[in-house]
């Protein structure tokens, strides 16, 4: 039987895992950096496209060529315009990259961590509408992956229910606080049998939203001190907000 990989295509970070010879999940590392998570960031250079930490670093000097948080655009009919340096309404006249095309670049980088595996399960937020699901499937198709989709908290329940020496009985609630969304799944679990009762989510409550609230506080203090506001799109400011969040 061919191997099947699991992919977390996240708003801020993404990851890929496969089962080892003993059937245990193993998160694969980026061969270049050694990190087990990859920044969901894409840099469109003049001669090449870069995905990951180096793409984030490029935003310091070439912000208009770097795409962040594409997952939050999956249900929108927009393109990322390199001319404008942002997502704009797709009126069919502008040249750019759709959210699916950008996501496919992230998926392609992740799938390069393993060899010749074309079947995958991708986790998605519980609140993803049909359009966002379709865009995710299109991204997988562009990266030549045959995929199935599963809600992120549901995947967590299935994992824990099937762990060795773990016995879950009764109703189980799993919270998934990600970079862009906050999801909850409730399941009835008896041994290894899992019956998902409901999955819901809030697409405006995630790590990036915390970052923005921190920037608002910093902006208020900076205005009081310097008489002018902060650029909330400045990669340096975004990085500072993320660091503060982690300290908290």
Predicted regions, residues:
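Hydrophobic alpha-helical hairpins/lids featuring a short glycine-rich hinge
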Residues: 98-100
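Short, well-ordered amphipathic alpha-helical segments that serve as non-catalytic structural scaffolds
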Residues: 105-113
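Oxyanion-binding/catalytic loops of NTP- or PPi-dependent enzymes
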Residues: 1-76, 80-82, 88-91, 95-96, ...
């Amino acid at each position: 039987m061919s191997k099947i990989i699991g992919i977390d295509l996240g708003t801020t970070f993404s990851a890929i895992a496969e089962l080892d010879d003993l059937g245990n999940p193993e998160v694969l590392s980026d061969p270049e950096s050694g990190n087990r998570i990859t920044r969901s960031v894409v840099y469109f250079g003049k001669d090449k496209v870069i995905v990951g930490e180096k793409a984030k670093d490029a935003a310091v000097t070439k912000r208009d060529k770097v795409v962040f948080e594409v997952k939050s655009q999956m249900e929108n009919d927009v393109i990322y315009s390199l001319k404008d340096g942002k997502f704009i309404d797709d009126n069919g006249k502008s040249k750019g990259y759709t959210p699916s095309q950008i996501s496919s670049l992230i998926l392609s980088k992740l799938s390069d961590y393993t060899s010749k595996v074309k079947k995958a399960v991708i986790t998605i937020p519980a609140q993803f509408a049909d359009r966002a699901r379709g865009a995710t499937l299109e991204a997988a198709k562009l990266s030549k992956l045959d995929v199935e989709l599963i809600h992120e908290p549901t995947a967590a329940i299935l994992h824990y229910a099937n762990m060795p020496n773990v016995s879950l009985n009764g109703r189980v609630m799993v919270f998934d606080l990600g970079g862009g969304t906050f999801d909850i799944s409730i399941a009835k679990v008896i041994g290894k049998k899992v019956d998902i009762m409901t999955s819901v989510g809030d697409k405006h409550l995630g790590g990036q939203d915390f970052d923005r609230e921190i920037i608002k506080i910093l902006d208020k203090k900076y205005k009081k001190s310097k008489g002018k506001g902060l650029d909330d799109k400045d990669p340096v400011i975004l990085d500072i907000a993320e660091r503060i969040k982690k300290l908290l």
